Design a protein with these regions (language model features):
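C-terminal transmembrane helical hairpin of 12-TM major facilitator-type secondary transporters
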Residues: 231-279
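C-terminal ends and interior cores of transmembrane alpha-helices
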Residues: 20-40, 239-256
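Glycine-rich segments within core transmembrane alpha-helices of 12-TM secondary carriers
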Residues: 78-103, 300-311
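Short amphipathic helix-loop junctions that connect adjacent transmembrane helices
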Residues: 186-203
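Symmetry-related core transmembrane helices of the 12-TM Major Facilitator Superfamily/SLC fold
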Residues: 22-28, 110-127, 325-338
């Protein structure tokens, strides 16, 4: 549904801020409604409201991605991606940990209400923010659906040795860049448990060290990408991610050690934060500002495909290879993208 956000301007706030405001308001009411619904009495209503929350949340993400892309120049996309990762992770921690703490003190209805009211801050920011310079929207909805594809392939329409299509290579890179990291993470909790770590140890070490390392990685990744350039950063951070993934293989053959676990988690999340920052900036730079919402949404959908396509086979690979060799495989599979 991303072409809707490229095609229609429905508010005096502009094409981007108008849609951001609408999705935020609808999301607030959906969260409040979800909190006020009793699952035991109205399971169907809970399911419907959960769908609304998911839909409006995804819609907000699409338009905010477009807003960030259009508000920043190509050279500023790395810092924009770094700020996005920092804010997103802090928001996840605040909502997740904060929600659990509040749930011990009050009913879940009030927790949902508080979470919804916190979003009013985002509404206020939307109202006072500047609208990015608008390009002319597509003349018809069909153009909004078709033209982003046509424009992307025309803009990158060259080929290598008249054989390999550059647009296809770009899409394959987006698909494969994080595949090793994604596969390693897909079974990480099962791996920690099998290695003898308790759920408390996993929750404490992984959440605390992992979050802090991701935040630091996003910050460092943004600075280094500006210093050495985006494309060198993608290669360097990709190699770092592959090396960091090997830390899980070390865990697999080592005795239980919280210090070793914390070290591996820190290194892996540091690399992931650096790689993700450069990766998002690359995707942003591949979009045309006239079709930002549609092209960005399509590329991020491709980015998330490995989680669906490859994670399902991870269990079978572990049974066949064992944990040590599985993580070596996850490390090696990252190199085709590089």
């Amino acid at each position: 549904w991303a072409p809707i956000f490229d095609r229609y301007v429905i508010s005096k706030l502009g094409r981007r801020r108008g849609w951001i405001l609408i999705t935020q308001v609808l999301l607030i009411f959906s969260i409040i409604g979800l909190g006020m619904t009793n699952p035991a009495m109205n399971a169907a209503n809970v399911a419907l409201l959960a769908i609304f929350v998911t839909f409006f949340s995804a819609s907000q993400d699409i338009v905010i991605d477009a807003y960030r892309r259009e508000s920043l120049s190509d050279n500023e996309q790395v810092l924009g991606a770094s700020s996005y990762v920092l804010g997103y992770r802090i928001g996840m921690l605040s909502a997740g940990a904060g929600g659990l703490i509040l749930a011990d003190l009050m009913s879940y209805q009030f927790v949902y209400l508080i979470m919804a009211l916190v979003m009013i801050g985002g509404v206020l920011i939307t109202l006072i923010a500047d609208e990015p310079v608008n390009f002319s929207e597509p003349s018809t909805f069909l153009d909004a659906v078709r033209n982003p594809f046509v424009e992307f392939f025309k803009r990158h329409g060259d080929s290598i040795n008249n054989n390999i299509s550059i647009p296809i290579l770009i899409l394959l890179f987006i698909l494969l860049y994080k595949v090793g990291d994604t596969m390693a993470h897909s079974l990480s909790t099962n791996f920690y448990l099998e290695m003898g770590y308790t759920k408390t140890e996993i929750g404490t070490v992984v959440k605390v060290f992992g979050l802090m390392a991701t935040l630091v990685g996003a910050f460092i990744g943004g600075l280094l990408s500006i210093k050495i350039g985006l494309y060198k950063s993608l290669i360097s951070f990709g190699i770092f991610q592959a090396i960091a993934t090997l830390g899980f293989s070390v865990l697999a053959v080592s005795a239980k050690s919280l210090m070793l676990l914390a070290s591996v988690i820190t290194l892996e999340n540091l690399a992931a934060g650096m790689g993700y920052t450069a990766y998002l900036a690359f995707i942003a730079n591949m979009t045309n500002k006239q079709f930002t919402a549609t092209q960005f949404a399509l590329m991020t959908a491709i980015m998330s495909l490995p989680r669906t396509l490859f994670s399902g086979s991870s269990g079978f690979l572990v049974e066949s290879l064992g944990w040590e060799n599985y993580f070596i495989f996850c490390s090696l599979i990252a190199f085709p993208a590089l």
